[in-house]
Amino acid sequence: MQTTHPKNLHLTCSGVERGFTNSPKTHPKMSSLKSFIKAVRASKTTAEEHTTILKESAQIRKNIRQGSNDMRMRRKNVAKLLYLFLLGEPTHFGQIECLKLLSSSRFMDKRLGYLAAMLLLDENQEVLTLLTNSLQNDLKSRDKFIVGLALSAFGNVAGPELARDLSNDIAELCSNHHNYISKKAVLCALRVIQKEPDLESLYIEKTDELLHSKSHGVLMAALAFAISACKINPSLISRFESQADDLIYRIRQLSTSTYSSEHNIGNISDPFLQVKILQFLSILGQNNPKIYDKMSDLLAQVCTNTDSSRNAGNAILYQAVRTILDLNSDSSLRVLGVNILAKFLGNRDNNTRYVALNMLKLVVNSEENAVQRHRSTILACLNDVDSSIQSRALELSTFLVNEANVRFMVRELLSFLDNVSDELRGSTAQYITEVTNAFAPNKRWHFDTLLRVFKSAGNFVSESTLSTFLRLIASAPELHEYAVVKLYAALKEDVSQEALTLSAFWVIGEYGQMLLSPTMNFDDDQTLPHSVSESDIVDIIEEVFNSVEASRYIIVQYGLFALTKLSARLGSSSTASRIDKIIYSYKRNKNTEVQQRSVEFHLILNDSKLSKTILEPTPAPLPPPRTTPYQNAEQKLKANKHVEKRVQESNELLDLIGLTTPSVAEPLETPVDEMTQSPQSSLSRAPSTSKKSHFEDILGLFASPAPSAQPVDSLASSFASLDFNASASQPSNNLSLLSSIPSTSKSYPPIVVFDKHDVTLTLVPSKEESTKTAVIEAKFKNKNPMTRVEKIHLEVAVPKSQKLKIQPLRTTSMEPGGETSQTLRVHGPSGSQVKLRLRISVVRQGGSNTLDQVDFGKLPSDLLQ
């Protein structure tokens, strides 16, 4: 008999223990989930962690391929797959393993299987169809907890097809005698109608019954379903109006007595239910005077009786104020709501203060006087340590600025700008600029305010603000001397603020000669220079060149341009020679743009005829437009009607002299919502080609002659140029050409399909009778009056039986309150229903990218008939 050496025996056992056996019948020993997590956390480098994960993934794949029916091993595999999913690793190879786990009759296995299915699967994967049988069986289980698992999984992963297959089973469970199952079934039905709105009729009657339930959970679920259904299909609001009296009675009971001690929070009776009822009543009462009258008394009672010392009470009060605003209640209720929100601002809880500031921003247009009474409290929030509260308080403060308080409010905002963090410095500077442009009492105050902004936040100022500042100075001759002296002194103190340096260079280049012999008396201000020589002016520009970073080439270019202009403004030949040497010294600069400017300006200075023409003083431009940035809808409507009337009167005058469509019409006034103008209207209001801007005059000296611009003719004459069959002598028949264009003879009311992130998407459907094509105009609107949308992108998909043509967006960005649109054309079988899947990407100014998907099938059914 052969004996084994003890050392060899030790090695053999060690190999088996570590799982190195190759026996096909024995599974290698797997580490537990706990040890896997410890191994990942113990990794000292990213590479080591990645290696650990790859080894474990390979082991899981191997176990799955061997096809063991051991449920314990399967649970361990799926648990590790969930951890890999949390780490962002691929887990597609384990999807079938999750479904196999559902075949077990044990609750433990089903719980893990459904959890994995909800996380590792989504409604777009084909493997989801294999889940149908398991869901159908578990929905009929006698164990209410297994039914609950199936309902939860169904609501999270079911797509439109699976929703249609099992919708009847869900409807039956809504009437189940177990409140636990009934509650989950209604919430599941909510998910169903969000994905397939056509199935709402299966659940409406059952929801009516459940709205009378005495169970807290069932009633909450029924209210959530009703709110969502009314938002998806507003025609259902009238269907639920009969429930208003019972809901009003319930909330009166909740606000005056203990309705259910089980759900009390801080002596507040069931605050979650109160909030949900108020949300639903705000929908029911919007267009129903009877419900509105009953709710006015109810809202006053809720606002009076609710304890505001508890956070739960504040939640109810907040929803009550939102309901007051949604219903457009009378002034007394709105003032009461404003007072409640102002009281929130004194709360210690940051969340309470934040939502109060957000809500006050919505009510300031309708109840400005009431909000103005709490101005000091709002301004105090600017000093909060929380930057998000500072940001909301800053936005609200700008809404409070008007002609009467502009000096006080801007002074407070400037004080805030001096101490604010870099995170908010740019937006603060922008807000101050906007309110100053709108309400400045005089030009000197306007200049002084923007100059202080440039001193505090010159590195955060936008190009548009810099342009407005220079335009303000150039358009006001009385500011020229004052501005050049102030900017010269500011430049001597600080050259670190880019906007301040650029504006000082431009102004010194244009009006630098005024520094030599000022006519104004500046003796009272000790910070201003009393005497300046030509060499002092050139010295300050050289000092800036020597102190700025080498990468800030834009400052050098502005400085070279200022020196070039100064050579014509200052009379000394020695100064002109010095300037020429400084400019020519940059001909070997690392930056090609600086090189080019150096050579160009050197050639200009050495050509007396050319320099005399180019370096003439810039003509005064038009002053910056004085527009109010924060107007309510009524003010905008009045302003636009006024503009349309002026344009119409202008067109009528042009008709009298035979010019039906003016080719060189300048607008008498700019509409408030300029972004909403169509491309045709923008063309018809284009400035005359014979009247160039002053900046074009300067640039034209270095450019080649431009081709003569053709006048903008009417739309008919534009189409006439496309008639290739007509002879040259034959007059074009514009009417016949226009008649060949397909006409949209039938239109439909607009439909709002998306309202998130302060962006709304409205679809305006119409039908071309001649081509049987559905034409849908998608209109985006930026509801935020403060921040712009940097980029917006829309992706659209239709069913396979239909064809889609989509035109690009008119503009991919939206100013505050602005709009943009694009046109969709859908062609398909006659009588088919147009259904759209919309994917909307929104990038806000200073914010992150948000991506939302909307499935919409409620378009008119006769679009393709």
UniProtKB/Swiss-Prot annotation:
It is found in: Cytoplasmic vesicle, Clathrin-coated vesicle membrane; Golgi apparatus. SMART domains: Alpha_adaptinC2 (SM00809). One of its GO terms (molecular function) is clathrin adaptor activity. GO terms for biological process: endosome to plasma membrane protein transport; Golgi to vacuole transport; retrograde transport, endosome to Golgi. Residues 665-690 are annotated as: Disordered. InterPro entries: Adaptor_Complx_Large_Subunit (IPR050840), AP1_complex_gsu (IPR017107), ARM-like (IPR011989), ARM-type_fold (IPR016024), Clathrin/coatomer_adapt-like_N (IPR002553), Clathrin_a/b/g-adaptin_app_Ig (IPR008152), Clathrin_app_Ig-like_sf (IPR013041), GAE_dom (IPR008153). GO terms for cellular component: AP-1 adaptor complex; cytoplasm; cytosol; endosome; Golgi apparatus. Keywords: Cytoplasmic vesicle, Golgi apparatus, Membrane, Protein transport, Transport. Its main location: membrane. It is a peripheral membrane protein. Residues 675-690 have a biased composition (Polar residues). Pfam families: Adaptin_N (PF01602), Alpha_adaptinC2 (PF02883). Residues 746-860 form the GAE domain. It comes from the Eukaryota. The keyword Translocase does not apply. Adaptins are components of the adaptor complexes which link clathrin to receptors in coated vesicles. Clathrin-associated protein complexes are believed to interact with the cytoplasmic tails of membrane proteins, leading to their selection and concentration. The AP-1 complex interacts directly with clathrin. Adaptor protein complex 1 (AP-1) is a heterotetramer composed of two large adaptins (gamma-type subunit apl4 and beta-type subunit apl2), a medium adaptin (mu-type subunit apm1) and a small adaptin (sigma-type subunit aps1). AP-1 interacts with clathrin. Belongs to the adaptor complexes large subunit family. This is AP-1 complex subunit gamma-1.
